[in-house]
Amino acid sequence: MISMTKTVYIKTVGCQMNVLDSEMVIADLKRHGYTVVDTPGEADLLLYNTCSIREQAEEKTYSALGKLKETKARHPEKTIGVMGCMAQKDQETIFRRAPFVDMVVGPGQLHAIPDMLTKVTSGEGRQMAVSLGRKDGKQTVVARSHETFDPLRDPTMRPTPFQAYLRIQIGCDKFCTYCVVPNTRGPEQGRSPEEIVSEARVLAEQGALEITLLGQTVNSYRHRGPDGETDMAGLLERLHDIDGLKRIKFVTNYPKDMTARLLETIRDLPKVSPYLHVPAQSGSDAVLKRMKRGYTIADYMEMFERIETVLPEASVSSDFIVGFCGETDEDFQKSVKLIERCRFKNSFIFQYSVREGTKAAANLIDDVPREVKAARNNELLAVQDRISKEDNQKLIGDTVEVLVEGPSKKADKSDLDAPIVQMTGRTICDRIVVFDGNRRQAGQLMDIQIDDVSSHTLIGRVKTVEVVSLGMPGLAPSS
């Protein structure tokens, strides 16, 4: 049994799925007597929840681990663990590169951490728990090795008490040639709608006003149960009825599964956010084919025009990879044109990074020079920033409803007792809004009038309601 006086520090990088995983790991560790601390120096257990989507993210993790070598030498009683996608991908490599690490835990084995800790602290040596690889057995067997322990939750680990992530799907079966996720997260599996709705009710009871549904291709969600099949639209309809929830968001979407039925459901359910993150990755059919994305630009535009028709108020964002294998200047300019046509709310733009274990690493040549990747990255960012600012400027003078998240990063550095600080929040379309207010407004839905904008932020003020005195019957106005 784990001692009841242990402390844990956790560092999380990567996607929202990792943030949720960290919340659940901490909830589990608290049940075993651990308390959370803010710095590595205070901790008996140091956990690093890692990302493998790009090489840079992995190298940053190895660099952070390297800084712990002396700490471990001075304090051998401390336990160091690496969890998440890099743990599943690199496995024994982590022990070779950082031999002072005690535990390596893949994202499908996080429930094993307490038992692994018991073994480490009782002198049984280094521990590793990872899921089966795609070729290590039948898909059903491999899928079972990628377990989650939803809905084990800890509200104190969330970015705010009134916003929560809810996993509805794990894994991915798309096998894009550049991506490690099908290997690190395993086969695509949808949780049962009953589990999801039950967990959402718990989150609402804990004070969550907004939930964000998570999946690698979240709009592909399907679950077949004894009462038939539930798709994403059907799930949203069930979640919409939960008392206390004000907003429902979901990320990330796959273009070919953005159906008319789903869009009509979003349109007809007021709580569901019309913010749609639908990665295009490239504007070139040739590049998309090498990426094995499963659609053409004509397919993407058919989907986009469907959004414009059914849900004209939607804000759509995208992802782009620049410098993918064989990308020419002409290919790249097609990505520029796609952004200019679609006028995305924002785009997450990345330089291609070779990932060991992917089809691209095995079969394609990383032939775009690093400096060309950087130049294309900067150019595409500039185009997107210009478009984002132009479209944000159209909102000046409008009033938007904002879920106030708390003090902005700027305000965090200001006097904690200041009566007025810069607050931040988001609209239902996921636009960031800042305004002067006070800390008590966190968790409220407020009307904010927009006075100014940047590419990424709306700047406003709390809308005041004018009170007009009509006088009282029988009373003459004072002179």
Curated annotation (Swiss-Prot):
Comment on bound cofactor: Binds 2 [4Fe-4S] clusters. One cluster is coordinated with 3 cysteines and an exchangeable S-adenosyl-L-methionine.
Chain positions recorded as [4Fe-4S] cluster 1 binding sites: C15, C51, C85
Coiled-coil stretches: none
Protein's UniProt name: tRNA-2-methylthio-N(6)-dimethylallyladenosine synthase
Family: Belongs to the methylthiotransferase family. MiaB subfamily.
SMART domains reported in the protein's UniProt record: Elp3 (SM00729)
Organism field: Rhodopirellula baltica (strain DSM 10527 / NCIMB 13988 / SH1)
Cofactor(s) essential for the protein: [4Fe-4S] cluster
Physiological role: Catalyzes the methylthiolation of N6-(dimethylallyl)adenosine (i(6)A), leading to the formation of 2-methylthio-N6-(dimethylallyl)adenosine (ms(2)i(6)A) at position 37 in tRNAs that read codons beginning with uridine.
Gene it is expressed from: miaB
GO biological process, one term: tRNA methylthiolation
GO MF annotations in UniProt: 4 iron, 4 sulfur cluster binding; metal ion binding; N6-isopentenyladenosine methylthiotransferase activity
EC numbers: 2.8.4.3
Entry's Gene Ontology cellular component terms: cytosol
CDD domains cross-referenced by the UniProt entry: Radical_SAM
The protein's assembly and partners: Monomer.
Sequence positions that bind [4Fe-4S] cluster 2: C172, C176, C179
All copies of domain MTTase N-terminal, residue ranges: 6-122
UniProt domain Radical SAM core: residue ranges: 158-390
Location of the protein in the cell: Cytoplasm
